[in-house]
Amino acid sequence: MSSVEADEPDRATAPPSALLPEDGPGPDGTAAGPPPYARRWAALGVILGAEIMDLLDGTVMNVAAPAVRADLGGSLSVIQWITVGYTLAFAVLLVVGGRLGDIYGRKRMFVVGAVGFTAASVLCSVAAGPEMLTAARFLQGGLGALMIPQGLGLIKQMFPPKETAAAFGAFGPAIGLGAVLGPIVAGFLVDADLFGTGWRSVFLINLPIGVAVIVGAVLLLPEGKAPVRPKFDVVGMALVTSGLTLLIFPLVQGRERGWPAWAFVLMLAGAAVLVGFVAHELRQERRGGATLIELSLLRRSRYAAGLAVALVFFTGVSGMSLLLALHLQIGLGFSPTRAALTMTPWSVFLVVGAILTGAVLGSKFGRKALHGGLVVLALGVLIMLLTIGDQAGGLTSWELVPGIAVAGLGMGIMIGLLFDIALADVDKQEAGTASGVLTAVQQLGFTVGVAVLGTLFFGLLGSQATASVDDGASRARTELAAAGASTTEQDRLLADLRVCLRESASQQDSERTPDSCRNLQQARPAVAEATARAWRTAHTENFSTAMVRTLWVVIALLAVSFALAFRLPPKPREEEGF
């Protein structure tokens, strides 16, 4: 379909207003603007399909990550990289993606992004090792950042002001449905192991959706680009990408390498490069050149506070979501499906919280409702950590549901208001750019959260392993003695158990069994069974303790977010039809 055909109203289905001549008079006799795009609602379905693909790609990985590592091998940092790879590329390239759409055409960039994203999903599904999967995830994130920003511009282009709110309102149910069903479908696919695909089928979900989105985009989306061709800040792009990479890489890899000097050198270098990025942007602004970020926005203290709240808040909640999924599967031994169903109340009540905010809380209470959402979320996290700490190995899904549900409700209230309040002091003509930067910071928070909280959690697993064995040593000795083990044999087995648990938590190859663990398997059958029970108890205790301590850090980050939120505007932006 040509651009001319795409822009011509379909007279059989178009509303009367769409059939008026472009330059003809309106109902009041004044000149009417161009008619709205006739296929706009069908085109909106294409844009929603792309959003769902992006959402699924994030939610399914939390469920599939343990199975990926078990199959491909590698250290625990593999789990971090297959998540960080996507979010880091998405965060860095998100603003650039919008600029490319303005320059080369939104439809063209949407189609290129959708084709590339779908192809990258297939690459993920056939990855032969963790390195290939991580590279494919980086590619996915970059192409997602090219595809997703075009939707905002296309919606503004296709819909008249009176329909814009309804168009954006369609995102809520679509995203809510994807958030609820995504993990459940992923858990089922991993457990079902259809045709021997296992976790690989999780990435193949995007194939039929991607094909439908691509075909729909070609047939339904209108052409369009910015009236004025924007400039592109290549140097700024290179600086921010290299700076963030230099910071994130040692955060993820430093722990398993024993925090060598090069890790700290790289982090210092990354910080220096980011300072250089700010200096470059200031210089470009003085010269009237292209900038990656509108620095005038950062001078608005309340908007800058919104960026700070988003960074700290999403650092806490994104890392928590991944680690909870790992704790359920690796720590407690839940199947992927059971883990996904256990976490479903999070998504369900998140949607409920967002609906409540949009219907009542946001307009009536403003920033107070946002603060309330943070308190409810922190309460849910507190309930979770107390439940995990008290129950340890005997934990059931139903015991976790109250904390997860309360946390999800608070999360929904918070994110339902954050963007509207953070953008309240931004001028109308700057809203698109400001929203793009805020979304990029949100994705950066996802990246930092997985890197920092993941490193903390995995570090705790190694450092407290010995204490976890010692906590259950008395019971283990009783069971070993009943199995016929002598005192000397008990001492040796417990010593090997301490080393085994520590090495299992910090080993760089999941396919290799540490020597200390093999020693445990060489005992007599009755003794080996008692030792295995002791290992499972210590293993679960180790994960539970690490999870509890990490959740305290999450609560601390929520407290920081609560304090920073006092700098936000008291009320959200009033809808003005843009």
From Swiss-Prot:
Cite the GO molecular-function annotations of the record.
transmembrane transporter activity
Q: Please give the residue ranges the record annotates as the region Disordered.
A: 1-33
Q: Which Pfam families match?
A: MFS_1
The GO cellular component terms are: membrane; plasma membrane
Record-annotated membrane-spanning stretches: 78-98, 109-129, 135-155, 170-190, 202-222, 232-252, 259-279, 306-326, 341-361, 369-389, 444-464, 546-566
Q: What does this protein do?
A: Promotes the efflux of actinorhodin.
Name of this protein: Probable actinorhodin transporter
Q: Which organism is it from?
A: Streptomyces coelicolor (strain ATCC BAA-471 / A3(2) / M145)
The protein's gene is named actII-2
